[in-house]
Amino acid sequence: MTTVYVTHDQVEAMTMGDRVAVMRDGVLQQVDSPLALYDTPKNLFVAGFIGSPAMNLMEGDVVDGGVELGDYVVPVSRDVLAKAPNETKLTLGIRPEAFTLASEGIGLDVAVVEELGADAYLYGSLVGSGKQASIEDGEAHQVVARISSRRPPQRGEQVRLGVDPASVHVFSQETTERIS
């Protein structure tokens, strides 16, 4: 039996539905399984809507070999960059759980540490950016990283967040569509 259930609660939608339709202002954005929506969002709206905490959406300058976030260049393949040849800025999407503490990587000024037992959430801004880096509907938000650590960094510390380039989503700023 097919049932259509309408909700504004993403957790409800993700747990109750075999397929979920994400709409924005009455326009269908993407229809897929909950996991596919999470893993391969079609655009910035779906990326920012699905997941709790939400995907980090960070704007950076296109440079040789990748996208510059704060004081670090996240590697992005030439094939992906070629899909947005005229764009000087792209938006990178990184899920909080995709980060690891590392000796090299994206610099984070830790503002808040939320300890949850086996995991901790770090909230902060990118090193070298002079601003909070995550964006959603044009508003700045803190970057969130979920780390598995018994000894998380402390508030005020500066850490490096490693990320596997395969887990980075790249979005066009012109179209808001995912290009990676």
Task: Name what the model sees in each region.
Residues 1-4, 10, 87-89, 111:
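Alpha-helical hydrophobic/aromatic positions enriched in membrane-embedded helices and signal peptides
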Residues 2, 7-75:
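Internal alpha/beta loop-helix hairpins
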